[in-house]
UniProtKB/Swiss-Prot annotation:
Catalytic activity field: formate + NAD(+) = CO2 + NADH
Coiled-coil features, chain-numbered ranges: none
Membership in a protein family: Belongs to the D-isomer specific 2-hydroxyacid dehydrogenase family. FDH subfamily.
The organism of origin for this protein: Solanum tuberosum (Potato)
Domain of life: Eukaryota
Binding sites annotated in the UniProt record for NAD(+): 150, 204-205, 224, 259-263, 285, 311, 335-338
Gene designation: FDH1
EC number: 1.17.1.9
Protein name stated in the entry: Formate dehydrogenase, mitochondrial
SUBUNIT field: Homodimer.
InterPro entries linked: D-isomer_2_OHA_DH_cat_dom (IPR006139), D-isomer_DH_CS (IPR029753), D-isomer_DH_CS1 (IPR029752), D-isomer_DH_NAD-bd (IPR006140), FDH_NAD-dep (IPR033689), NAD(P)-bd_dom_sf (IPR036291)
Gene3D superfamilies: NAD(P)-binding Rossmann-like Domain
Keywords (A to Z) from UniProt: Mitochondrion, NAD, Oxidoreductase, Transit peptide
Length: 381
């Protein structure tokens, strides 16, 4: 079965002092499953668009399908604290579905409590809300809908770059406030053409962003663990930079497109930010925890970072007193870039497809696996 591990692993578990994985295999059986989905509550907005599938009310549009097959589908937005609704279902759920936009943090402690849990699905891209090492050790499968919102995020990143470069937000605020002061905007508004833009990470989203930046005649750089083939580099017009800090020192604009891992958590700390050009613009739609929160605030206050934009925070939802809400020259939003209606349709369909394969004992598309057979996907190692 796609969700089970290889027989040799099960044999090792029999003789192991801790047979958590083997026990889970014994409990896994055909029949109805308890599936829990954690999504944000949309309230009055839930009924405004029939394709608004990513909210708790519409629950990916799969309730009728799941229940027609005899499965139980519990949906809740309540995910934090020992008395939350999610916690009540942890002991006996088989599948947990979450999104990056309202993540259910699956800790090692929760994994230990979830004796029936077999599958963790991310409706979207990015499964860092799961303790992946604990999931691997427990024999769980973790998968996401790879590619479902790459276009959405890349388009959003381009928008944020332009908002920062053109100093758009202060002008917009002037209109709202009944003001008119061209000089207050123009003194720090620039063209994108001719600027050096570097992406930290050039996977699916990073490459799409570089492709969309090419017509702007920028100097395009990228840093990644893997170099693109020469033909693709030439098509995009981007140059590979093996040394991250050397690339960063050249950039007028830095875009973060790397997953959150143990290696990238806090990657942009005070020391690294100090190596950036004074007046650099940063766009981060990857993960908030890649940045040192206070270091970003300090650099924005000093002017070393001239503008910071993104839709990712740590934690999420961001508390009302999160310092990024109040730092100067920021163009922050809630986590929205990857949850356009088009993206919701794609990741809802992808989630349904994986559930269907899971029920049938079939493998998922290989690129969707984040944890399989006790192994993490390369980008998370």
């Amino acid at each position: 079965m796609a969700m089970s591990r290889v027989a040799s692993t099960a044999a090792r578990a029999i003789t192991s002092p801790s047979s958590l994985v083997f026990t889970r295999e014994l409990q896994a059986s055909p029949g109805p499953k308890k599936i829990v989905g954690v999504f944000y509550k949309a309230n009055e907005y839930a009924e405004m668009n029939p394709n608004f599938l990513g909210c708790a009310e519409n629950a990916l549009g799969i309730r009728e399908w799941l229940e027609s097959k005899g499965h139980q589908y519990i949906v809740t937005p309540d995910k934090e604290g020992p008395d939350c609704e999610l916690e009540k279902h942890i002991p006996d759920l088989h599948v947990l579905i979450s999104t990056p936009f309202h993540p259910a943090y699956v800790t090692a402690e929760r994994i230990k409590k979830a004796k029936n849990l077999q599958l963790l699905l991310t409706a979207g891209i990015g499964s860092d809300h799961v303790d992946l090492k604990a999931a691997a050790a427990a024999g769980l499968t973790v998968a996401e809908v790879t590619g479902s919102n790459t276009v959405s995020v890349a388009e959003d990143e381009l928008m944020r770059i332009l908002i920062l470069v053109r100093n758009f937000l202060p002008g917009h605020h002037q209109v709202i406030n009944g003001e008119w002061n061209v000089a207050a905007i123009a003194h720090r508004a620039y063209d994108l053409e001719g600027k050096t833009v570097g992406t930290v990470g050039a996977g699916r989203i990073g490459r799409l962003l570089l492709q969309r930046l090419k017509p702007f005649n920028c100097n395009l750089l990228y840093h990644d663990r893997l170099k693109m083939d020469s033909e693709l580099e030439n098509q995009i017009g981007a140059k590979f930079e093996e040394d991250l800090d050397k690339m960063l020192s050249k950039c007028d604009i830095v875009v973060i497109n790397t997953p959150l891992t143990e290696k990238t958590k806090g990657m942009f700390d005070k020391e690294r930010i100090a190596k950036l050009k004074k007046g650099v613009l940063i766009v981060n739609n990857a993960r908030g925890a890649i940045m040192d929160t206070q270091a970003v605030v300090d650099a924005c206050n000093s002017g070393h970072i001239a503008g910071y934009s993104g839709d990712v925070w740590y934690p999420q939802p961001a508390p009302k007193d999160h310092p990024w809400r109040y730092m100067p020259n920021q163009a922050m939003t809630p986590h929205i870039s990857g949850t356009t209606i088009d993206a919701q349709l794609r990741y809802a369909a992808g989630t349904k497809d994986m559930l269907d394969r899971y029920f049938k004992g079939e493998d998922f598309p290989a690129e969707n696996y984040i944890v399989k057979d006790g192994e993490l996907a390369p980008q998370y190692r």
